[in-house]
Amino acid sequence: MKKLMWLFVLAFPMAAQADYLDVIGFKMNPGCTMGKYQQIVQDFRDQWANARGYKVEILVPGQSSEVGMYYWVGRISNAEAFGKGLDAWMSAQSDPNSGPAMLMARFRECVTNQSRAGYITR
């Protein structure tokens, strides 16, 4: 019986995990390239996201009715962790010399957000 229990525990460690997904639809501003945007995203990872357990990937359309629409998909352990990170990010925006404010300025120069939604995985 113990072996069966351990098998279950080891085989399904993520069963109770419910990640939070932060999905932002955006379009590139004139003069911004995907290469430039990807560098901003990498700087965001290095300066902010990695320390908080926030992962991000960018979805680039391969087939879509809106080929100019891209998606930022951020993933973190749960909604509470996302909320704490977002609170800290927003608080830092009041200081234009803070890392988050400087990153946000670079994001705004490069893209315009069209939509934002949060999802919980099941």
Which residue ranges define each predicted feature?
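Non-heme di-metal
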Residues: S98-P100
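Short S/T/G/P-rich N-terminal loop/turn motif that feeds into the first structured element of a domain
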Residues: M14-D95, A105-R122
